[in-house]
Amino acid sequence: VADVIIEMKDYFVRYLKKGGILIISGIIEERMDEVIAAVESAGFSNPEPYVKEGWAAVKFTL
């Protein structure tokens, strides 16, 4: 799932308005930092990660 999210990061920007919220999930905890960096590089900010039992979800603001 991490690879798909990273590949789609630019699509998320196209379909959300400024100030919009993006929530992504199904990320293996070990790849969370990589996904956060990629999504931030597309213009999102304020990542709020949630981790449970090795899985992560992250909330971003555009």
What positions do the PLM features span?
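S-adenosylmethionine
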Residues: 1-62
